[in-house]
Amino acid sequence: MLAALYYVLKGDPYKALKEDLESLKKAKLLTEDLRITEKGMELIQQLISKPISLKGKVVSGDGEGRYYLSLEGYRRQVREKLGFDPFPGTLNVLLDPTSTEKKSTLMFKRPIILKGFTENGKRYGEVLAFPARVSGVEAALVIPLKTHHPPEIIELISPVELRKALKLKDGDEVEVLVY
């Protein structure tokens, strides 16, 4: 994938795609007619079933998570779909470069969808949620479909205030296991 990105940046996306596809064929993950092989399916199944480890540093947010998690439309769905009553706030983590890249493998996992809703005439969007653990504490990684955060920032919700429960401060390193 990095090779493909390199070629795209050099201005030849067709060559990049062709080389990427050729490497997948050589690894016997794709057939000549671009179907996923049994070996390719096994690899995808492994990606889906294994937890993804993301590492980064705790950073302060702007308080928006507190606002959104005070809305009953989201709270109710978290209780129903994730099985916990969320603390009204998120823990923001600035991922290291390797973890930022690894975050894209979440597309192989099936998200829990918190549906959008309207409250007091205002529309709130969908949020993708993935069960997770932070230092052994139950949590969920949440990805709002509309966000101002850059890709290297993730937000975590939990039944407890993660900062307090884990004695975290800005700059502390954490590992998040996403299931």
From Swiss-Prot:
<feature type="binding site">
    <location>
        <position position="155"/>
    </location>
    <ligand>
        <name>FMN</name>
    </ligand>
</feature>
<comment type="pathway">
    <text>Cofactor biosynthesis; FMN biosynthesis; FMN from riboflavin (CTP route): step 1/1.</text>
</comment>
<keyword id="KW-0479">Metal-binding</keyword>
<dbReference type="GO" id="GO:0008531">
    <property type="term" value="F:riboflavin kinase activity"/>
</dbReference>
<dbReference type="Pfam" id="PF01982">
    <property type="entry name" value="CTP-dep_RFKase"/>
</dbReference>
<keyword id="KW-0285">Flavoprotein</keyword>
<dbReference type="InterPro" id="IPR023470">
    <property type="entry name" value="Riboflavin_kinase_archaeal"/>
</dbReference>
<feature type="binding site">
    <location>
        <position position="92"/>
    </location>
    <ligand>
        <name>Mg(2+)</name>
    </ligand>
</feature>
<feature type="binding site">
    <location>
        <begin position="160"/>
        <end position="163"/>
    </location>
    <ligand>
        <name>CDP</name>
    </ligand>
</feature>
<dbReference type="GO" id="GO:0009231">
    <property type="term" value="P:riboflavin biosynthetic process"/>
</dbReference>
<keyword id="KW-0547">Nucleotide-binding</keyword>
<keyword id="KW-0460">Magnesium</keyword>
<dbReference type="GO" id="GO:0009398">
    <property type="term" value="P:FMN biosynthetic process"/>
</dbReference>
<feature type="binding site">
    <location>
        <position position="147"/>
    </location>
    <ligand>
        <name>FMN</name>
    </ligand>
</feature>
<keyword id="KW-0418">Kinase</keyword>
<comment type="function">
    <text>Catalyzes the CTP-dependent phosphorylation of riboflavin (vitamin B2) to form flavin mononucleotide (FMN).</text>
</comment>
<dbReference type="InterPro" id="IPR039063">
    <property type="entry name" value="RibK_CTP-dep"/>
</dbReference>
<feature type="binding site">
    <location>
        <position position="90"/>
    </location>
    <ligand>
        <name>Mg(2+)</name>
    </ligand>
</feature>
<protein>
    <recommendedName>
        <fullName>Riboflavin kinase</fullName>
        <ecNumber>2.7.1.161</ecNumber>
    </recommendedName>
</protein>
<dbReference type="InterPro" id="IPR023465">
    <property type="entry name" value="Riboflavin_kinase_dom_sf"/>
</dbReference>
<dbReference type="GO" id="GO:0000166">
    <property type="term" value="F:nucleotide binding"/>
</dbReference>
<dbReference type="GO" id="GO:0000287">
    <property type="term" value="F:magnesium ion binding"/>
</dbReference>
<keyword id="KW-0288">FMN</keyword>
<comment type="similarity">
    <text>Belongs to the archaeal riboflavin kinase family.</text>
</comment>
<keyword id="KW-0808">Transferase</keyword>
<feature type="binding site">
    <location>
        <begin position="61"/>
        <end position="66"/>
    </location>
    <ligand>
        <name>CDP</name>
    </ligand>
</feature>
<dbReference type="InterPro" id="IPR023602">
    <property type="entry name" value="Riboflavin_kinase_CTP-dep"/>
</dbReference>
